[in-house]
Amino acid sequence: MSKPIQMERGVKYRDADKMALIPIKNMPTEQKEVLRKPEWMKIKLPADSQRIQDIKAAMRKNNLHSVCEEASCPNLAECFNHGTATFMILGAICTRRCPFCDVAHGRPNAPEAEEPKKLAQTIHDMKLKYVVITSVDRDDLRDGGAQHFADCNREIRALNPHIKIETLVPDFRGRMEVALEALKDNPPDVFNHNLETAPRLYRKVRPGANYKWSLELLRQFKEQHPHVPTKSGLMMGLGETKEEIVEVLKDLRAHGVTMLTLGQYLAPSRHHLPVERYVPPAEFDELKEVALELGFTHAACGPFVRSSYHADLQAKGLEVK
């Protein structure tokens, strides 16, 4: 029997080390068992442009993180080339250990007090008009990090008065009331919280999360801020059925959510949950039609869609695939 990992504060645990900490064990996928990517999942990545280097340099200068890099997003090159990025606040170490996610797990350091000001200045320097702010889960904080989100919103608007801010928040497990109170005076322009998958798969995909809790977070925020759109996203290809996804869409609408993203799950490594199937583009198109029929005002559905992929276009209701 191997010794349990003794986590040190500020150390990132990834891949096999991270998966070893999950109660539901996921055996590494052998190369011969990995599903071959279909043609529609093969994209030509743009060259490592100067724009990409400039954005990375701006991040490093102010000790900031992008979820694009930390979660190994396949759209990084495209988004960076277009001058957009999703900033990840509260550090790059998550207190959760979801087996689909490539963000490192461990004992995070205390939040950096100057991060909101640094973030606001970086956004100003990059001349962004729409920004997405997300974070790792911070179960070690009394409010789950909600006040830090509010501080970032306030500082960003102070330097960038015409900007639109979308926040992609964690579930604030056990801290919903205090978290929503912290966000009360500085809400975002779009409030995003991902359900990720169907409730049947939560124990495997989102250990530590609760489907009904996440729905309630979306409902309560909308109740307190009726003019702020709420948004959620799901991954496809983890073993869910189309019928289960439709039921989740109905639940989201019943809780006031009007913006939706559906995308293909891609395993970051053989140590993560394997891809059960690659969903054809036509099926994404069908689900988009279902979503619009259910009353979603915006639905971005396609193999490469992610929560923050072209989020500015999503917010305008433009086509994103």
From Swiss-Prot:
[4Fe-4S] cluster 2 binds at C94, C98, C101. Its cofactor is [4Fe-4S] cluster. It comes from the Bacteria. SUPFAM superfamilies: Radical SAM enzymes. Keywords: 4Fe-4S, Cytoplasm, Iron, Iron-sulfur, Metal-binding, S-adenosyl-L-methionine, Transferase. [4Fe-4S] cluster 1 binds at C68, C73, C79, S308. Pathway: Protein modification; protein lipoylation via endogenous pathway; protein N(6)-(lipoyl)lysine from octanoyl-[acyl-carrier-protein]: step 2/2. Residues 80-297 form the Radical SAM core domain. It is an enzyme of class 2 (transferase). This is Lipoyl synthase. The gene is lipA.
